[in-house]
Amino acid sequence: MHKEEHEVAVLGPPPSTILPRSTVINIHSETSVPDHVVWSLFNTLFLNWCCLGFIAFAYSVKSRDRKMVGDVTGAQAYASTAKCLNIWALILGILMTIGFILLLVFGSVTVYHIMLQIIQEKRGY
């Protein structure tokens, strides 16, 4: 009878003792660039004197687009312009709204006094 021989290869220590290699991935944190879209939308809807709110809204959208593309410098430039326009829109909007209300009140009081004088003259006082 013929015997077959089987060879067993020795592979070394078990794989659990081999240390795995580590890979380091550097993820750059995005610089937070506020685009002021909500503030611009508020100024557009409620304080849009001289169309500054609408222009600020356009710059805010451009800032958001630049941020989505990855152009942080361009996004910051558009955001800075939008912020400046929003400040001016807010200041002018508040001042012109107060001025309009004062003009309306004083105009109404003046018309009331003129009408009162006309009524008194017709009655013969």
UniProtKB/Swiss-Prot annotation:
GO terms for cellular component: Golgi apparatus; lysosomal membrane; membrane; plasma membrane; protein-containing complex. Keywords: Antiviral defense, Cell membrane, Immunity, Innate immunity, Lipoprotein, Lysosome, Membrane, Osteogenesis, Palmitate, Phosphoprotein, Transmembrane, Transmembrane helix. The gene is IFITM1. It is found in: Cell membrane; Lysosome membrane. It comes from Homo sapiens. GO terms for biological process: cell surface receptor signaling pathway; defense response to virus; host-mediated suppression of symbiont invasion; negative regulation of cell migration; negative regulation of cell population proliferation; negative regulation of viral genome replication; ossification; positive regulation of osteoblast differentiation. This is Interferon-induced transmembrane protein 1. Residues 37-57 dip into the membrane without crossing it. Its main location: membrane. Changing residue 84 to A: Loss of anti-HCV activity. Only localizes at the lysosome. The chain crosses the membrane at residues 87-107. Residues 1-36, 58-86 are cytoplasmic. IFN-induced antiviral protein which inhibits the entry of viruses to the host cell cytoplasm, permitting endocytosis, but preventing subsequent viral fusion and release of viral contents into the cytosol. Active against multiple viruses, including influenza A virus, SARS coronaviruses (SARS-CoV and SARS-CoV-2), Marburg virus (MARV), Ebola virus (EBOV), Dengue virus (DNV), West Nile virus (WNV), human immunodeficiency virus type 1 (HIV-1) and hepatitis C virus (HCV). Residues 108-125 are extracellular. Residues 84-125 are annotated as: Interaction with CAV1. Bone (at protein level). Levels greatly elevated in colon cancer, cervical cancer, esophageal cancer and ovarian cancer. Expressed in glioma cell lines. Belongs to the CD225/Dispanin family. It is a single-pass membrane protein. The modification Phosphoserine is found at residue 16. Interacts with CD81. Part of a complex composed of CD19, CR2/CD21, CD81 and IFITM1/CD225 in the membrane of mature B-cells. Interacts with CAV1; this interaction enhances the ability of CAV1 in inhibiting ERK activation.
